[in-house]
Amino acid sequence: MSILRDSGRHYEWQYLDLMRRIWEHGDERVDRTGVGTRSVFGAELRFDLSDGRMPLLTTKRVYWKTATREFLWFLTGNTNIRPLCAQGVEIWTDWPLDRYRKETGDDISRKDFSARIVADEAFALRWGDLGPVYGKQWVDWPVFEPVGDGLFRRREAGVNQVADVVDSLRHNPGSRRHIIEGWNVAEIDRMALPPCHKTYQFHVSGNRLNGLLYQRSCDVALGLPFNLWGAALLVRLLAQQCDLQPGELVWMGGDTHLYLNHADLVEAQLSREPEGDPRLAILRRPDSIFGYRIEDFEVTGYAPQGHLSAPVAV
């Protein structure tokens, strides 16, 4: 059991404590986006995942189905936003939209851009690709083989890190190499956004599977609620596929920040108190970790407080 749950304190207080620490004591910094942040370096959160528990925030609505659709898209290795837009998921739309506007001078609306991505395959191929982001590295990390005379060629099939972790958890649970890495130095420049939630590691203790996520850069107000859900979901899926019980999720942040233009959201959220104990049920066990569908997931006991919004920094 998590020490936080044993103490009787609601799991979400640690998130709110981190938010308050950053907002009240963080260093103000000029960041890549030009928006400005308050930031701390080095943070840790821990969540109990037993009995269906998930780190789903209650002090604002977190759209867990949207986060799940994004996560399942990662597992496909797809890097084009078209499948996401077709499901109404706009998490990644702002980056291709920004590039399209800059290169064409067309001040198209986000809604119209997304609709065109869905309707026009050629347009999506030209403007909807993000480069070799997250899922591509997770399931198709490039491998180069020698062909003689000091030359190399890319192997058709790359490394499927997710499949390798499933295999190692099943056959060598005591290994310290259960890792999924997204930070491919050679391909960073080709990515619309370098991976923020970059390194996942897994640990088996008895029949319990624990997971750790290291995040190099973390937007606490908008990104972290989705990142926590995705990391916990990955632990849950791996546990089910490997006949283990979910244990604990440990989250570690590097540059952990709040954007200055998120002030209204931060102050509203810090005025609220967490409540409830949502649980996630996985309704089906497919033959592979790559076979899950959105219909396989059901959340109960989730009654979040009102929606809070803020702009995304691109």
Curated annotation (Swiss-Prot):
Signal sequence extent: none
Active site: C196 (nucleophile)
Gene Ontology terms, MF aspect: thymidylate synthase activity
CDD domains: TS_Pyrimidine_HMase
Enzyme Commission code: 2.1.1.45
Residues reported in the UniProt entry to bind (6R)-5,10-methylene-5,6,7,8-tetrahydrofolate: D219, A313
Key words, A-Z: Cytoplasm, Methyltransferase, Nucleotide biosynthesis, Transferase
Keyword DNA-binding: no
Reaction it catalyzes: dUMP + (6R)-5,10-methylene-5,6,7,8-tetrahydrofolate = 7,8-dihydrofolate + dTMP
Alphabetical list of Pfam families matching this protein: Thymidylat_synt (PF00303)
Compartment list: Cytoplasm
Metabolic or biological pathway: Pyrimidine metabolism; dTTP biosynthesis
Oligomer and partners: Homodimer.
PANTHER family on file: THYMIDYLATE SYNTHASE 1
The protein's name: Thymidylate synthase
Name of the encoding gene: thyA
